[in-house]
Amino acid sequence: MLRKSLTLIIVCAMLVAAGLSAQTKVEPAKPVRMTDRTGPNNGITDVPGIEVGSYDKNFTGTTVVLAPKGAVGGVDVRGSAPGTRETDLMRPTNLVDKVDAIVLTGGSAYGLAAADGVMLWLEQKKRGWDVGGGNVVPIVGAAVLFDPGRFGRAFTDRPNAEFGRLAAEAAYSGPVKMGNVGAGAGAVAGGLKGGLGTASVDLGDGVMVGAIVAVNSLGSTVNPQTGEFYADFLEVNGEFGNLKRPFAFNAAQDDALAMATPELGKNTVICVVATNVKLTKAQAQKVSEMAHDGIARAVRPSHTMFDGDAVFTLATGLLDLDTLKQQAVWGNTAANVLKIGAAASDALARAIVHAMLNAQTVGPVPSYRDKYPAAFGK
């Protein structure tokens, strides 16, 4: 009898709990941003010692991130369909400790040729690994995304060495143009027009962290149930324009879009994060690893069998964290790397949103702005 009574009480308690959960919707806690400050450009060029240039033509292009004084490099590749260059060289156990440039480019593996143009341009500037006799070998890492044959162009119409040279010549430390630009010119992300995006984080004490990304993901950057960006909660000071929640029918349309057959094997998110603090190669690699969380926050699913997701880190080393005034704030070395990595993750997620907000509709592939006008009060 006692056993039956206890069973009845437990069942009733479960029913009451189920009823309460059905009536009360509990919103999950949102992660806290690292900071509410960005650099003046809100881009990777806010990092001292970093320049960016892009060149594109006929819906494909190349973006170059230059470190004129060199930078310690790290990289972490988590997609299962990558196309990269010089990633082995950036391993902490390998010799070369300075990187001159990172190339993000369209063209799939063919697009790696754009890095040749950047190398030749740097050689003319005498920037690179000194091999004696007045000769240098520029260290240029690269990652590619798949865009050949899109938007009606020929499959053979893709970036080459000239794209890389022109992008390097255009590099400067000012505001970065976003959207259908450079490596983002032919990008498509989860059924919407992808693009190039950037963002920065000001951690105080002169410490800057920035990110730049070309978004060509298999997964969507948009929650199909709401039409909102997955990474919208990371917005700093209204940088996304204080977007409104789209109408229900827009969300339903995007749900159908998300279920559409994807372009398997034609996707990736390729990124560079940078900071002006001094890091070792191992620490730079750790920052790249942590920055991948920014992709996972902003794109679902991410790091798939069909993506080539890669994150490079450049540390220009103009600041030494051990000499900063606010040592009580910065703490020990491991904690400092944690802060830089967490800031890089936030900046990368926000850069992905900026890429989507600045993209423009091309042919049958709509931009977020055209797909969700209600988000902008239209």
For each predicted feature, which ranges?
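Bacterial N-terminal signal peptides
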Residues: 9-17
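Bacterial Sec-dependent signal peptides at the C-terminal "C-region" and cleavage site
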Residues: 17-25
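A structural signal for small-residue-enriched, beta-sheet-centric alpha/beta enzyme cores
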Residues: 24-109, 113, 124-378
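Short Gly/Thr/Asp-enriched flexible loops that form oxyanion-binding sites at enzyme active sites
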Residues: 114-118
